[in-house]
């Protein structure tokens, strides 16, 4: 009987499940938002007008009032300065210009890859033309081309034929490419590297 009392006593003392309380943060995601208009929380700022004239050090509320009178925004341009520097401007136009500049910078930042074109020294004419087209396409894209001729067994004895084929590839793509590394034997391969011509 004692075990029954202990068993039922244990269940009677079960606590009701605790409710999970989720605290909402009002500033969630605020860190990623730009510091403009009402989001500026500094006690004092250095304000600059839309035409570049200094308005002096003032409370952000006063600078915001000036910006609103001109239908413009107050934007923090230098948060680290003492006091932080804010400028009166059209924020939509400013953001568009920044995105445009970043896009142009990304376009100019093409990194040259090394593409490989493999063939045998006994390659047929059609297959050679395909490799030549690939080489020209890679060079036009601004990439380097590693032309590789693979040898099997005793074929390495014909290294002179392989070198002639690589030099023919260099001559056929000479309009847009130049030899960066002369043909050389590496293991069971002969390799030549072409790079786009500097304009």
Curated annotation (Swiss-Prot):
Function: IF-3 binds to the 30S ribosomal subunit and shifts the equilibrium between 70S ribosomes and their 50S and 30S subunits in favor of the free subunits, thus enhancing the availability of 30S subunits on which protein synthesis initiation begins.
Subcellular location: Cytoplasm
GO cellular component, as recorded: cytosol
Quaternary structure and interacting proteins, as annotated: Monomer.
Species the sequence originates in: Gloeobacter violaceus (strain ATCC 29082 / PCC 7421)
Primary location group: cytoplasm
Keywords, alphabetical: Cytoplasm, Initiation factor, Protein biosynthesis
Gene behind the chain: infC
GO biological process, one term: ribosome disassembly
Record family assignment: Belongs to the IF-3 family.
Protein name: Translation initiation factor IF-3
